[in-house]
């Protein structure tokens, strides 16, 4: 088994500032699938980096039986240094810049370099690891299949995402253009990819890191790349993905107090949270629009009209 660590350049500003990001590789030297792991595409989502570290540590301890695993453990070095989701002062979201443009904005240039590096290696699967709100549960997030890929690729993605044993959720094109996310752009290029949302950002939460590590190892086991004990994640075994929604949104401003917890099953019209004025009067009650599970809750108590304050996986 061969291991390697290297740095690749991601910007073309050689005369001013050259940025490089780390790449980790582990090769069994036996034929098999190639899996890429990507993490910290948003600079404040450091838990994903820890998950990559722990996955590689586990693989070195248990041995990779076949194939290879490559990883970008810390993509957004600029955001990481500034504890920011974005890559620069223009507040570019790197995960809305794919597949990128070699002559575009800084975000588009970085995205192009990353995208080309991954696609040229012809991987069998890419797992993009993110972190959500501080109060959130880990889940596997897949792109809507009908619009972005062939049925064959979509079924591969579902099979791999389901093998994580995490809550399985389908993203929504209504919220943003999924064509410009890393996973969406890869699927459009014919490469199976999905996202793992593993707990809160900003800090490394060991419980979330463990869940994320086990989810990735469960996928590798499904691909017959390792022999690993059954994963501890057993949240959802639904054959059909649940639907991601950011509803209900706030229509008033004030202080929000939640009446549900991440991971909790909810019913239609159930009270999820109430918004209070500075005098303590209830200005608004937010209710579930459909049955499902709570994925995460807003980090801040202050809310404004039109703001997303909760993430829910609705039952189909």
Where are the model-predicted features located?
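Structured catalytic-domain cores with a bias toward divalent-metal coordination
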Residues: 1-316
